[in-house]
Structure formats: C-alpha cells, structure tokens
Amino acid sequence: TVERGPGAAAGITYLTRSDFEGTFPRVADADRVMDDAVAALNLYDDEQVAADAALYEDSLATSFVQPLVTSAGSYWQLGEDGELTDLGYELGSDYDDARWEIVLDFVSLSDMQHLVLHGYLATGQISGIGKPLTKEVDGPAQVGSFNQLSYGVGYPAPTVLAQTWNPALAREVGRQLGLEAATLGVDGLYAPCANLHRTPLGGRNYEYFSEDPLVCGTMAAQVVGGARDAGTYCFLKHFAVNNQDSYRDSLYTWLTEQSLRELYLRPFQIAVEGGTTGLMSSYNRVGAVWAGGSRALLTSVLREEWGFEGAVITDYADHQDYMSADQALRAGGDLYMDGVFRNGSFSYGFTQEELSSARGTDRAAAATSYLTNLRRATKNVLYVWLEARAANLDYNTAAAEAGTAPIERPIKTAGPNYVGTALALADAVAATSVVAWAHRALRRRRESR
C-alpha cells in the first residue's frame, strides 16, 4: 500500500483470494464526507517542501546561480530551420551525454520556469539554444483537439485495434498518426492510453485498448514506436490507475501493491521498456497522494526501477488546487499543463536573487532541490523532442539501406498558417450560411401554416 509504518492500514479490509468469505463485502458502506481539515493534510505544504528538501541536504547543486546567457554559440544550437543540428541529434540519441549540463547552462532560470510551467498544448521556444515552439494535441484515435482548426483521420477506437492482436498493425497506425501530426504542424500527441477496462462503465473505455495488461502494454508500445518512427513523440496516459472518468478529480484510489504492479502499472512498464519517452500523470490519487505528485510513482518506480528516460506531464490542471506544480516538480514531474484559466506558477520556487543568497543558510537544501529538479525537468522536455526527431532520422537511414520508403516530415516553419486559417474561415462562413438557410426555411414553413 502507499502508506507505511505502524497502523497505516488500520481498519482497512482488503479483498484477498485466500479469504473471499471474510473479505468480500456483503453490504455497501454508507458514503462519508471527508472533513476539510483532513483533506488539507493531503495538500502540498511547507512541511512536505521541507521533507523533499531534506533529500538534498548532503548534496550540492551544480551551481546556485543559473547562468544568465541569452544565446549559445552555433555549436550549442539544438535545432536550426526546422531540423536538428548534429548536436541535437547526438543529444537525442544519448540521454546521458555529458554535454547536456553545458546546454542547460545556456538556459536562463526564467526560460526554464516558463518551459516547465506552461505545458498546455505546447512547449515554449528557447531561442538561445535553437529550441522551437512545439505543439501537442490529443488523441488516441485521431490527431486533433477540441480547440484545433485541423484534424487528422478518425480511426477506429483503440479497442478495435487491440482486438486484432496485431502489433505490426499497431506500429503502422502509430506511423500514420505521427505523419499526420507532422503534416498538421503538430510535434507531439497526448496519446495513446494504457489504462485498463476495469469496468464496462468506464467513461474513457473507448480510448483504452483492453482489460488485459499484456495486450494493452504491447499495443501501446507499438503505437508509440510507430509515431517515433515518424518523428512525433507521445505522452502515454494516464499514469496511473485512471479507470473511471466521472469523479476522477482527486479521487482516492485504494489498492494493494500486488494489484497495482501486476495490473495497472504493467502496461506502462511494457511501454517504457519499449522506448516510450513521454507519460501523462492522472487526476486521481494513489492512496492519499496525487499521482502527478507521487515521488514513489514518478521517481522510485518509473525512473529508478524501470529506467525511464523522458518527461512526465500533468493532466489538465487549471481547475484543481491539489494539482501542485511544486509537488509535481519535486516528485519527478517535468511539465505542468496549466490550461486556459490558470497561469502556472510555483508557490515554493526561487528567484535568481534568492538562489544566490541561499548558500550557507537554512534554505540551501530547498534551493538545491528546486534548481536541481528544474534543470532535470528542462532536460527531459528537451530530450523528448530531440529523441523523436533523432528516431525519425534513424528510421529513414535504415529505410534507405533496406530500399524501403522513408517517413519524411514536412519542415515546420514559423509564422501564421494562412492556408489553414483561410480554410477554417471558409468553413465557418459555410456553416453560418447553412444555419441561416435552415432558420429561414423553418420560419417560412411556420408562416405558411
């Protein structure tokens, strides 16, 4: 279980195969309302910040001062004119390259904060190192989001794909989704989904592959791999135990570690071992801890046990106070999806002046925690973009050697999309005309009666 220590599971009866008679519930318990004071104990506060900072008491940050360099030299540029530089390709091919630390030294503190805090449908441009503005959209069966002007092809639901049990077909679907994304000017997808069909009533079942962890993980890994072949990265979602859509916000999800690992984490583990570089955390809690702020989940299991290399983004976070950007950062999260109505911010962040003055004070560990995790998150976001582009270049090299067709991404250029905007306006005018015509026709019919 998530809680540890004496009395952690007091009063909780877990269903077990060894004693169905004694543990299977006969009568549903009455609903209980959590007291506000109890709920507040599970919000990220000064005490939890101090506990996270204590992990850094015996370590030092690379520097308490993030260099204020506005532009790196040409060698340190990661991208140029819509394509990767040699350095960008090399860093995208090697997460542990020592030059990462030098690249991070060319990113200002404000650029890091902006990148990490504002992850809704995009990641920000960092012109000093040649990182362009990137664009991300949904979804599991179609490239596009509710607020996008252009959509890709609508494919059958992932459940149908899973029923084929054809990993090669899933790979081709991923390649097609990745290429469509590139054609529409999209860099990454909030897809696919690796949650399970726990109940037929699940509100997102149409986005999920299966009730079986092996099927789910295998198909998800292949879709992600296919998208990477096309140079498009994926944020596999929702990590973890997001098996209902109604009332999932801040939902306290209780389960044994056995069921967590064998069922609900297994699909994600398969996908990570298959090369997935992006994950989206979930709204719910695992035990009492928000999944997007769980160090046990995002660091201990995901990175230290599974060896995950990449970035974790929160789900849409513009309407929930429990989804703390500070908690996510220190737990191992990398991107905060702040949304339309909330401007992402850190309540326990540091300015450059505060970092400079923290050395030798009782705030030194907290400053180290903040800057170390901020640099890590920046690296991870950059890596996800670079790794997908490098994977596409590798795919095309292998295709050329094998005499097969490459997957050429259209070069993405800056500036407005005049063609797309014009088509969208034409659609809007046409739709308005149809509605107006229908209104007039209905009115004439009524007047003729």
Predicted regions and their residues:
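Glycoside hydrolase catalytic-domain context in secreted enzymes
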Residues: 1-449
